[in-house]
Amino acid sequence: MYWKTDTIEIPDWDRHSLLDRLEPFDPATPRELADQMVAYCRFYGLDLWVEHPEVVYHQGYVEAGRHQVMVHYYRLPESFTPRGTVFILHGYFDHVGLYSQLIDRCLGAGFDVLAYDQPGHGLSSGTPAAIGSFIEYQGVLSDVMAHVQPKVRQPWFAVGQSTGGAILIDYLLSNSHSQETS
């Protein structure tokens, strides 16, 4: 695991308090992050606005099926001529907090980044690490993409690790995408 500190810190946040304060994802509405959310981001190295002060960080939830899915969005300024948005889909038993290095690399390469916690993982709702059917993951991806479509830059790229990769492949195969549209 990757921490940005030399010592292990005791988390200065409570998951239930964070969930109670989550608001709908809307990058058009700037919001001050609660101290506990800043502590959460710092603990997992997601506070990339410290290393990239030009980046604007947005977070909130998206209604996806029967779940509230936590979305993290890192947006570069127009002056950087962003190349699009990279979606990051994590694996089983993971959450976005494990991908700070990948997010950092994508930002450094000129991409905005959107990552979300799968249902039952991280700060998303749902029974921990459980899903009724794998097709639910595909539905969540579809709902997240539909919700953010008018709000995040295109073109879109995607990276999926383990279960996240399977979700992407399943989505592309199930929705009859061609090489040009995938």
Q: What positions do the PLM features span?
A:
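An N-terminal hydrophobic leader/cap segment in hydrolases
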Residues: M1-E63, V69-L76
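Short glycine-enriched nucleophile-adjacent loop
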Residues: G165-H177
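A conserved short beta-strand
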Residues: S178-S182
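Conserved alpha/beta-hydrolase
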Residues: I103-G126
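Short coil/turn segments at beta-strand junctions that form active-site/ligand-binding loops
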Residues: R83-G84, G110-F111, Q154-P155
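Catalytic nucleophile-loop/oxyanion-hole region of alpha/beta-hydrolase
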Residues: Y92-L98, G122-V152
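Short beta-strand element of the alpha/beta-hydrolase
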Residues: P82-G91
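Alpha/beta-hydrolase fold nucleophile elbow
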Residues: K151-S162
